[in-house]
């Protein structure tokens, strides 16, 4: 598979290979895989070990979130949450079957939510920055952070600059080895053009109105999908301001977060299962 070819190239080029891009994942993931090549492991096992480790981090983080804010039976609810996350079919297939790394960035997003509601915004945005350094999909959480800023005034707009700063910091080993600084930006810019299909096996808005396998619709709706998503998210911001929605409530925050992520998946182009 493509993961095996990435492994072979990274192992062959050693640490100096960080100066060149391998695959289409961001630099921090390439650094982790380089470190794994130093161990006597089969490539596929190594990828899956990394992902499975973060499955446990994700389960623990989610359990911590529930334990921190549950009003009763906290221990039981935390244990049930931990079990539900770790034994979820989505989590199991994603990591141990497909060797994907989604549990990495989602773990840090959960930790960010936990620390945000513990009134530790710097730590929260550091975790968001780490998540963003691993996966572009972290941007799905950004709108709800803007809502939180507007609603509560408990964070500063300056906190948002922590996100790109952490991305740069985590990519520094590759920059030191000679990687062009602009690569930090172009990696994600190129990802937005990956697939060139309006939707990829994702039952979203575009699956209802066009043939997802026809590349014509990708070019027809790509820019429209961005404007539509921004418009829908903007309407929600207006509602939050007009209705004076209090996002200090964790329950309200989580519901708004779920709606925000769902909106991005439903209306952005090239979403896949």
Enumerate the predicted regions with their spans.
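Transmembrane and membrane-interface helices of multi-pass
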Residues: 66-70, 78-91
